[in-house]
Amino acid sequence: MERVIQETDNDAFSCKISAITKRYLPSSEQKKIGNYEHYEDIHLEFCKEIKSRSRRKYANITKACRHSLPVMNYGTYLRTVSIDLKLTQWLKNNLENPADKVQVINLGCGSDLRMMTFLASFPGVQWLDLDYKDVVTFKSTILRSNAKFRASLQIEGDLPEEPSSIENVITDRYQLLPCNVTDDEQLIPILKKYTDFSVPAVILTECVLCYLHESKASQLISTVTGLYKQGYWISYDPIGGSQTNDRFGSIMQDNLMESRQLSMPTLMVFNSEDKYKERFPGKSEIQTMWDYYQNHLEDSERQRLKTLQFLDEIEELQVIFSHYVICTTNWRI
């Protein structure tokens, strides 16, 4: 099951490269907040490193770029932009003074490269990426082997003669470590060693909770929110839909099982906006991607998106994006 879940990271990264090459990303609003001028270069550089290490992964990327449908690029755009902007706003609110410190903990980070932009933008940020060992080994090998990434993340030390022996990245402000985040015996010692429970923490779970069994997801939320005195959780996931005639969730489950033998155990448990946000403590806010598209994007940005690829089925966007949510939670002990 772990291996199958890890494959979804390659899908997500492939979709992001497609959205970047077709100019969906970065968005106009991302460009306004700064430090996105190297966004494309960072991702294409990482993609080049993938090509030299895994033909299969690179083939998936090129296939996604050749055959990506507008709805997929819109989805990647909304997913990426909504998370980035909510994270940016929270960091700005909590880093008003030069001495302020916060930490970002990305649970199930995969190939996500957000840390490059945010570490450059916010000197008061510490960043911790966690994922399964195989994912971390592959990502850390690229980060530690590439001169541009080493300079950006201030990675020191010689590269091991055997790249496969690289299992982490540890610098003053950035750590990438292997961890099964659903195992408290692995997770808690890492958080104790590399984070400060008295410092405000942002927790990112991007399409992570949906792949966990309900008990494991609840345990993860309870463990993490119980450790930090103040925190902000950003979670992005699909929801199955709660209306009687809504078959989105069941169709999605059938397709995943048929194509990958993969399940989303809580897709139909937390199948509505209200049910999804109730799983978190503290004050939570939730928004579907359709609502985000309709009410958050400026008219000029929606018009820009329409010029990138021909899209004739706006109703399809509404159906799909009404079943993806971004949920944010503030808590304080």
Swiss-Prot record:
Record-linked SUPFAM superfamilies: S-adenosyl-L-methionine-dependent methyltransferases
Recorded coiled-coil stretches: none
One BP term from GO: methylation
Enzyme class of the recorded protein, top EC level: transferase
InterPro entries per record: LCMT1, Ppm1/Ppm2/Tcmp, SAM-dependent_MTases_sf
The keyword tRNA-binding is assigned to this record: no
Catalysed reactions listed for this entry: [phosphatase 2A protein]-C-terminal L-leucine + S-adenosyl-L-methionine = [phosphatase 2A protein]-C-terminal L-leucine methyl ester + S-adenosyl-L-homocysteine
Binding of S-adenosyl-L-methionine, residues: 79, 108, 131, 180-181, 206
A GO term for molecular function: protein C-terminal leucine carboxyl O-methyltransferase activity
Enzyme Commission number(s) from the entry: 2.1.1.233
Entries under Gene3D superfamilies matching the protein: Vaccinia Virus protein VP39
Pfam families hit by this protein: LCM (PF04072)
Keywords attached to this entry: Methyltransferase, S-adenosyl-L-methionine, Transferase
Keyword Coiled coil: no
Role description: Methylates the carboxyl group of the C-terminal leucine residue of protein phosphatase 2A catalytic subunits to form alpha-leucine ester residues.
Entries under PANTHER family matching the protein: LEUCINE CARBOXYL METHYLTRANSFERASE, LEUCINE CARBOXYL METHYLTRANSFERASE 1
Family note: Belongs to the methyltransferase superfamily. LCMT family.
Protein name in the entry: Leucine carboxyl methyltransferase 1
Organism: Kluyveromyces lactis (strain ATCC 8585 / CBS 2359 / DSM 70799 / NBRC 1267 / NRRL Y-1140 / WM37) (Yeast)
